[in-house]
Amino acid sequence: MIHNSSYTEAADIKSLSSFIEESSRVPDYISESNNIGWSSNINNPPLFESSSFDITTQNDNWILTETMQNITTESSSTFSRSVASSVFPSSSQAFVSPPSIIDIPISSIPESSSISISSDVLSSAITVSQTSSSSYSSLISSYSTIQSTSSSSISENEISSSSRISPGLLSSVPSITTSFSSGISSSVSPTSSLQQIAEQSSNSSLAENDLLSSSLTILSSVLSSSVLLHNSGVSSSSFTDNFSSTLTNSSNSLAILSSISESSLINTITDLPSSSVLLSPNNSESSIKVSSASSSSSRRKASTYTTPSRIPFSNSSEWYTPLPTPSISSSTNDTSSLLSELALIGISSSSSSSSSSQFYTSSTSSSSLVSSSENYSSSQPTTIEPITSTISSSYSDLSNDGEILSSTLGKSVYYSYIQTFDITASTTTFETALPIVTAFNLKDSYTFSKPSSIITTDLHFYKDWLSGALDSNEENGNKSKNAGTIAGSVVGSVVGLLVCTLIVWYFYIRKRRRNQKWKSFEVPSRSKDVEYNNNDNPFNNEFDFQHRVPPPLPPQRKNHNSIGVPPSSMGLSNTRSADYHMRFSYISSSTDSSDDYSDSMQSALHIGSDSGRERSNDVPEMGYLREII
């Protein structure tokens, strides 16, 4: 599985090692192609410590043997192929040993690397030295040691040259400059200077066959070589040799490699069983790809990912023109043995430096003949628009619709899958696929399913993934536990407040209903009846004695001396009292007898005077019936 990723901050190597030990998820060795391989064998991820290339002679051909050491299973895998003797120096051996990923401090990973190869005439040996500077924060390791020895004779004159190594498949990796020098053994008459050899080559005095037979070779394979090691079971190795004529920048410079034709170089590679050769000419360059398969049959799955050529949010602000990205194939077998893959990219048949312009946007070349050497250097490329490249892998199908890998470690089970994320920020948005590992406890019952759609998240999640903060299961557990506590507290507080409010409201409403006073009012029909009765009731003032009309005064008693005239001897008070007594008394109630009034009575009824006045029977003031009552 090849996956796009980058690191912009130096992650803690201790946390990375602990995560590798706990979850058995070992990130592969990150090559210059900005790719990370993730192992399909989570239970037993292989970790390759070193890779060696042995070159031996057999029947005028060189046998290139590649050996990979697996420090996990303490096993090694060896693959051999035959190459013509003209490609490599006579009897040389090269070892490429990148250090283990766990032992490399992140801060010491070099940004640029310089390899110097010098030859010693007396000892007939080639000395290799390497210098590197570190400021690039990622898992890209350029540490390598290349040793080469030669058994052939070294002429008195040695050619020292310098060239710039191509950054490989990743254009955004800082440029790596490699300088080397090698001896030349040839049947051609010795020359005194580099310029004379250059003139011989430019005048075509040396034929192509003469060049091949004279073994005029330079370690061109070191000019632009990259070793791609996947430490976690991706089981693929790529050794790229870029044969380019960057040794020359003018028509008078050395043009040794330009005499080697494409057809002669292609014929030097012998087809192995189950191998394929791909030739894709591009102008003056050809690409040869030899892919050897294991003897045991294995099921292959292919997946394709489109990755940007620039690391998002990296410290570098420069863009590099990317190389034509080859298709990297890898396969696994039942014994997790390593398969080798050889990709010879950029075979140049031109003696000019035009091929180097394909790899770099701008370059500055300088040539000097001091101490018989040529030095080439190139400035930092200019900024161009980014492009995308497609990398195909046949190792394991872990795309969005791919399978989910599981591994049991202790009391936990781990699920690993590839999830596509849409990272959004304030100024940029990009889409990337990230490997995700989810852990569950074996004692708990759970159901796990991989998200099927693209997850949109912010830049904070992406930075946490790069720094390794998401790799700690304990930290995630603590965060989730704290989040659950906070959420529970908030929900409990809200629910408690609602319950208290409901209780208070219930008692308040109940008390209000109990003490509520209803207002009384008369029915309209009854009000009309009462009003009518008040006006027409004859007995309304029956018991109101103050408004009752007093009865009339009874007539005065008979006085024999003077009828109708009160005696003079009676005072005013007696007159009034008698009058009052007569007024409110009936005749029948007086003490006098009816004989006393018989003489003076002129009518059937004698009406007494009112207020001492004699009433007239002709015009009575009161009605007859009223008087009787």
Swiss-Prot record:
Sites of glycosylation?
Answer: 4, 70, 203, 242, 249, 282, 315, 333, 375, 478
Q: Name one GO cellular component term.
A: vacuolar membrane
Q: How does it sit in the membrane?
A: Single-pass membrane protein
Region (Disordered): which ranges? 365-384, 529-572, 591-618
List membrane-spanning regions.
489-509
Q: Where in the cell is it found?
A: Vacuole membrane
Any idea which UniProt keywords this protein has? Glycoprotein, Membrane, Transmembrane, Transmembrane helix, Vacuole
Principal localization? membrane
Q: Which cysteines are joined by disulfide bonds?
A: none
Compositional bias of kind Low complexity: 533-543
Q: Which family does it belong to?
A: Belongs to the TDA7 family.
In Swiss-Prot or TrEMBL terms, this protein is called Topoisomerase I damage affected protein 7
